[in-house]
């Protein structure tokens, strides 16, 4: 069953997308100067084509002429070729009579012709500038009809945000054109999920039944059709309680290029990683719909609003954010603006290659408002762009998107592109992703996030950082912050050795310092320091923006003998203890059902009931809270007694799996979704060799279907054992039934007990059932080997072997931490292969049954 979005487009009146029709007010004429092969500017500063001008592609030329026509006050179109030529293209004024129904007297001859010369360059061979009709004045440009960015039936997208098919909006900082376009789209375009609305609700109900912390809400329109949807699972909601100070609404997937118009709410965790707070399917893009969405998000997050919010510049989103989050600092995603600039400024970048670099530096590397204003004016004047409409609209809205204007607010922006350029679903979702496939990839992305966060937690705890200074402050920070955040703090601290701080004012309690790099004393920063409160403020505002102290404040701390970080400069959200909840151990019971996921869900259900009872009165609340804290202390004692727990290996998550879009175990897939529209990647590292003998013929030993256990034998009883040298494997089918696929494992062990030492092979088979407990036990062993480095683990495999009298055989060997890590990666990959094959076989049999 193929799932798609249905668009019901009605007539759009004057705003209907078409190839013809322009606003025709006052006339505008000028002489054509063709003495510049790279393009010239006319008398009002608009870059125009000229004969001999070169482009790298046809699309690049079209983008240039589109922008030129818009700046001049007319719209253009691609003239279809009746002779089938692929080496010549003509872009003409929309008032041209060629191939149209216009009367000859109304025809306009303005055009540009490009020809393909060689294999790479398109060259302008003809340019007609004069029009036979009036052109739109500057204050009427926003009334020009939107242009199609498709050539005939060619539907290829050549640049993000450029193509504007019917029913789709693209980013524009021009409030007038944006508002007019959005109004028509919102009024006349209706998007629905169609027949999969029922499946979606059933999926949400199943998720909520399994996990009471799962939240979802649906907005209905006047026809009782699903209008917008929001959902968030318990892990996302818990993450918001710790890291919900800054939120980004990523709306790049709303456009019609994507089959699923979803928008994730994302944030940043204590490792600087992207995390998910919730997701929305946006079918109606009106003001009221976004108000509903933000209010629903706030309800799901227990009415805790964010400190800062990042969105696109959509008018409806701006209105909704102002109403629902009045206290939050709201900014526009600068990366959306920069992406749009690739289209709007294509003609300028072609004519002046250095322009793009200078503008980028102006936006991203200026540190004060005055510096930005000066740099912007310099760039605009240098390239004579004072009349460029789009750049002027950008400048008018500068306080909403240029980073320097909101450095006084917290955005958790520790790293340059963090929270802006990327997306939580990068690498998972593309333009062909359907709704059933989306939810499977959504779960895969969630599991990947969970695993990456745990890996970062373990790295922080188990691997001590290398200190670069004798500073007590560095040692303090190393024990407080996560590894990633400490790395940033350490970078700032080391830079203090290259900075000087000179006191320029002192009133007894507050001192003002001038801090500068000794190699660049002309660029200085002002730091004010209050001695009684031990608070410092720097003109760079790095701490206010990111929560990490800058090198300038740290330099002042050095000269004033502040040797450790004051408590108010240690943000809990950046520390290794940012998440207050105690993690549970991950030992797996023999039946395989008492996993961390089941225990977690059960505790969530009990905790919610407990919270509902405890919130009735203040007395009940105090008793409940006291018991929770007391219980937390007891759990901590138990956890310390049994040692660190192994990282959870959730269903569907593979250790070290590198491909994001491949789907792992079948239990990650909602059974209510059909699968015939999904392409699953097939690959096997062992496919290059000859086909191995069938497993049924090999009669290899099988891994016993029981979990592995730790052997606490005293170290002094240890004897020399074989060491693991290599692991190879292959895939075979035992039968045609689902799950009949097994992996044949070949371990090569080097036995030092023999003289001379020799290799020995151990071969056995694993199914997806027996592989899982083995993999989890190995992951636990790997953590135990994390320190000290000279420890080894002794592995004892018990195999079911029909060739022995007892029906069993044992093999014992030892592994180091690095060897076990390589073994883990191979086993995780094998698990993924077994899962993929199982899904394919199930799908194939289902198709046969349908036939």
UniProtKB/Swiss-Prot annotation:
It comes from the Eukaryota. One of its GO terms (cellular component) is plasmodesma. Residues 63-137 form the FAR1 domain. Expressed in hypocotyls, rosette and cauline leaves, inflorescences stems, flowers and siliques. A zinc finger (SWIM-type) spans 525-561. One of its GO terms (biological process) is regulation of DNA-templated transcription. InterPro entries: FAR1_DNA_bnd_dom (IPR004330), FHY3/FAR1 (IPR031052), MULE_transposase_dom (IPR018289), Znf_PMZ (IPR006564), Znf_SWIM (IPR007527). Putative transcription activator involved in regulating light control of development. Belongs to the FHY3/FAR1 family. This is Protein FAR1-RELATED SEQUENCE 3. It comes from Arabidopsis thaliana.
